[in-house]
Regions:
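Predominantly cytoplasmic-facing regulatory/coupling regions of multi-pass membrane proteins
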Residues: 1-92, 148-260, 282-285, 290-292, ...
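Mid-bilayer segments of alpha-helical transmembrane spans in multi-pass integral membrane proteins
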Residues: 95-104, 132-144
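Transmembrane alpha-helical cores of Major Facilitator Superfamily
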Residues: 96, 130-133, 257, 297
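Membrane-interface alpha-helices at helix entry/exit sites of multi-pass transporters
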Residues: 84-89, 103-108, 115-132, 284-294
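Helix-loop junctions at the membrane interface of multi-pass solute transporters
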Residues: 76-77, 110-118, 278-280
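Transmembrane helix boundary and interhelical junction motifs in multipass membrane proteins
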Residues: 66-69, 100-111, 259-275
Length: 332
């Protein structure tokens, strides 16, 4: 009997909690949108220039490409070197899976798309889990670092929320502990086993120097995600965008990681609420609400376009030696 079956209440919490959170947030956004004047909202959206829409979407794609790069680094550390474009393709196409309940579908799509290149499903899944853990941990630590620097230097207030430092510290602890290499590998194997795959043993030969280099790339990715929001704000309220660059480097990771921890599909609702609340003192109710919702729209459309282009534009060509790969790999 599995640990999960011994504790059915844990499974119920995992199912019920995201639903309750989404219902509460849906009520909040319904009330906020009801109070928003349609003409004002339409005028604000129409006033956003094309460069802000396109630039924000492009920066988002560059930002999440850092996670794809880190995933490839992990695969290389396990002795596999699939084609670069195939790795990027698998990563972006799999993003649609994060909107399904649970955390596993996106990772399974990744693993399935790389299987034709001789990468065992279990290995792709395990390294994908480690990548997600590190992306969240680096984001939390990056946000906490930026917040600490701003507060210690007496710069402009990061947020009106007095609980922000405690939220950042809690998220950092929650995400950094399982990201520790030995524990993340163990967690990845346990997750693979729960999904019905044989985790087996894989040789993980990635040193701390490579991991830290990958973490630096992930931090650059979080900067790009922050600039994606800033560019959107620049299109809505140009005078207010520049002063928000550094504070937003704490808000965006907090909102994204918070959405992940809350376990709503794709972080939907949670991320928008946290960004809206962070922007509220700086932009006002209407612009803060629109910025949060439009950012979700831009990021989702950018993901969909990138996945469609990569899916239709680059078909994987399977080398002959991979087609006749080791039977042990095929069984895995």
């Amino acid at each position: 009997m599995t640990t999960l079956s011994k504790r059915p209440w844990i499974a119920w919490i995992r199912v019920v909690l995201p639903i309750v959170v989404m219902i509460l947030l849906a009520g909040h956004f319904y009330r906020s949108l009801s109070a928003l004047d349609d003409l004002d909202a339409g005028a604000m959206i129409a006033s956003i220039p094309v460069w802000a829409w396109c630039g924000s979407g492009t920066l988002y794609l560059v930002g999440i490409s850092a996670s794809a790069f880190f995933w490839r680094l992990l695969l290389n550390g396990c002795g596999h070197n699939p084609p670069f474009i195939s790795t990027i393709r698998a990563f972006f196409v799999s993003q649609a899976g994060k909107y399904a309940p649970g955390k596993g579908l996106a990772l399974l799509i990744r693993a399935a798309l790389l299987r034709t290149h001789g990468v065992p499903m279990t290995l792709s899944l395990a390294t994908g889990i480690i990548e997600v853990l590190w992306t969240m941990a680096v984001g939390s630590l990056f946000a906490l670092t930026i917040y600490t620097i701003l507060e210690c230097t007496g710069s402009s207030s990061t947020s009106a929320d007095p609980w922000l430092p405690f939220k950042l510290l809690a998220l950092t602890c929650v995400t950094a502990v399982p990201a520790y290499p030995a524990w993340s590998i163990r967690l990845a194997r346990a997750s693979a086993r729960k999904l019905g795959l044989d985790p087996g043993e894989f040789d993980f030969r990635l040193g701390w120097q490579s991991l830290l280099a990958g973490a630096a790339v992930l931090a650059c990715g979080w900067i790009c995600l922050t600039l994606s929001l800033i560019l959107l704000i620049a299109g809505m309220a140009p005078a207010k965008a520049f002063p928000l660059i550094l504070p937003a480097m704490a808000w965006v990771p907090l909102a994204s990681v918070g959405g992940f921890v809350a376990s709503t599909p794709g972080g939907i609702g949670v991320r928008e609420y946290l960004i809206e609340q962070a922007l509220l003192p700086h932009l006002g109710a209407n612009q803060a609400l629109l910025a949060a919702l439009l950012l979700r729209l831009i990021w989702t459309v950018a993901e969909a376009v990138a996945a469609l282009v990569l899916w239709l534009g680059w078909r994987d060509s399977v080398p002959m030696q991979v087609q006749h790969s080791n039977p042990a790999d095929q069984k895995s």
